[in-house]
Amino acid sequence: MGTNLPTEVGQILSAPTSIDYNYPTTGVWDASYDICLDSTPKTTGVNQQEIMIWFNHQGSIQPVGSPVGNTTIEGKNFVVWDGSNGMNNAMAYVATEPIEVWSFDVMSFVDHTATMEPITDSWYLTSIRAGLEPWSDGVGLGVDSFSAKVN
């Protein structure tokens, strides 16, 4: 399926997405979205800004950086982490309660991140990915459905 990314942030009306995860009760893992942005319309390489949304995690793992506050986005509560992974700025939103199924607008997270990072309307949304990061075990971890669209 084709994509209309990269797209300039200021030209995006909405970016609806939905996910349905399956979570095991064992292992060390996280289930997250990665939203990538850059000041240029990149299609390869490392982007300047990564936004991670941790829907759920298990074990003693955490995002890079340190917690900088709390926020509510589209009715869900998150602890916000800010840091760098050595290649780009990384902002992570860690859900305070597990989220298994959710439909939301990616731009809600882009807009919130732009209040703390140098993202402007002239930057580009380059990718939206959903996935799983099993650190150990994680049998049963899965995605039943995922969709994303940029309007």
From Swiss-Prot:
An example Gene Ontology molecular-function term: cellulase activity
Annotated keywords: Carbohydrate metabolism, Glycosidase, Hydrolase, Polysaccharide degradation
EC number(s) reported in the record: 3.2.1.-
Gene Ontology BP, a term: beta-glucan catabolic process
SUPFAM superfamilies: Concanavalin A-like lectins/glucanases
Active site positions, chain numbering: E50, E133
Keyword Membrane listed: no
InterPro entries assigned: ConA-like_dom_sf, GH11/12, GH12
One of the Pfam families matching this protein, by short name: Glyco_hydro_12
Domain of life of the organism encoding this protein: Bacteria
Family as reported in the entry's similarity comment: Belongs to the glycosyl hydrolase 12 (cellulase H) family.
Function: Probable cellulase. Can hydrolyze barley beta-glucan in vitro. Could be important for the survival of M.tuberculosis in the environment, perhaps in amoebal hosts.
Protein name: Probable cellulase Cel12b
Organism field: Mycobacterium tuberculosis (strain ATCC 25618 / H37Rv)
